C-alpha cells in the first residue's frame, strides 16, 4: 500500500516513572496497565473515534481525525486516572503524561510518521505526570469549542525539532504546578501581569456538554 499524507490530530502518551514502577513491582505494574487499557483508555479512544496506531511497554500513539475529539479523550482519561489514583499511595500511582499536536502526517500501512508525530512526542515529554501539553495550533482550534483553560508555557526548544514550539498546558482543575522547560526542570515564573495574560479563562465543560 502506498503511503499517503493527511492532516491529523496526534496524541502521544506514556507512563511517568515507568522504570521505577517496574523495578518496584513488575507483575503488579503490568497487571494494572492492562486493566487501565481495557477499562479506561481503549474504550475512551473508541468513544472519541480515535485509532491506536501503536503501543509500547509504557506508551501509546493515537490518531484522531478531529482535534476536538483528541483533546476531549485526553482530558477524560486524565480525569478518570486522577479518580482511580485517589486512594493509591503516591509511590505506586500510575500517572500518564500526554502531548497533542495537529499536523501533516504520512500514513504507511497502519503506522504514521512525520514532523506532526514527532512534535506530539516532544509535547508529551514536557507534560507533568497526570498532565496534558498541546501545541499552539491545538489550543487555537479548541479554545472556542471546549471550555478548558490553558496555561501558556512559552516557546520551548525540544530535541530533533529545528524550530521552537509554543506549548500550552491544559488546566485540569488542580492548583497550578510549576512550569517545566524542555528538560523537565521547573521554569522561572512569569511576572504577575504576564501570568494573567498567559491563562485563557474558560468555565469547565460539563460531562453533558462533552
Feature map (PLM): residue ranges:
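Short hydrophobic "helix-edge" motifs at membrane interfaces and signal-peptide entry regions
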Residues: 3-5, 47-48, 126, 149-151, ...
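Acidic, proline/glycine-rich low-complexity intrinsically disordered segments
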Residues: 187-210
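Juxtacatalytic C-terminal regulatory tail of Ser/Thr protein kinases
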Residues: 170-191
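Short glycine/proline-enriched loop/turn "hinge" motifs that connect secondary-structure elements
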Residues: 1-4, 90, 191-196
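Catalytic NTP-binding/metal-coordinating core of nucleotidyl cyclase/transferase enzymes
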Residues: 1-75, 79-80, 209-210
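Catalytic beta-strand-to-alpha-helix segment of the class III nucleotidyl cyclase homology domain
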Residues: 61-171
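Hydrophobic pocket-lining residues within nucleotide cofactor-binding pockets
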Residues: 15, 105, 158, 205-208
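Residue-level signature of catalytic and energy-coupling elements of molecular machines
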Residues: 14, 41, 57, 100, ...
